[in-house]
Amino acid sequence: MTEHDRRHAELLAAFGAAFNRHDVDALMSMMTQDCVFFTLAGDGVHGNELRGQAAVRAAFEATMRAFPDAQWVQGPIFVTGDRGVSQWTFTGTKADGSARIEAEGCDLFTFRDGRIAVKNAFRKDRPPLPANRG
């Protein structure tokens, strides 16, 4: 792994840790001002396309409100050049307690100037579990 790739891998590990702390300020500090986030689902073939810090921040905050106990259990991280992949398992209970989600996923990243320019999220489409399942 090159030094360049190592720095990007460390960035992705820190990004995942910030998600698990629900630290949106830290997340946004790791993204470019003109960042793009392609959501898990949406009207477009790539999900919804959110552009810029304000839109991406709002989406991250909404996820954390919707799933107050959300965690992304980090799996392998792969980096080559200006592209990266982070595998994870998402777990979270809906805020109203009605259901729990547990599913594997990954993010595809594009880096620019030492930050994340694009985050493209993918997750297995699994039915919600009963909320009382641990």
Model-derived features with residue positions:
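Residue-level signal for the nucleotide or nucleotide-sugar donor/cofactor binding architecture
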Residues: 22, 51
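Hydrophobic (often cysteine-bearing) scaffold residues that line and stabilize catalytic clefts
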Residues: 8, 52
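Generic hydrophobic alpha-helical segments
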Residues: 14-15
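Short, well-ordered alpha-helical segments enriched in acidic and aromatic residues
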Residues: 23-39
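A short gly/proline-enriched turn/hairpin at secondary-structure junctions
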Residues: 36-50, 64
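A beta-strand edge to alpha-helix "cap/lid" segment located at domain peripheries
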Residues: 1-7, 23, 57-134
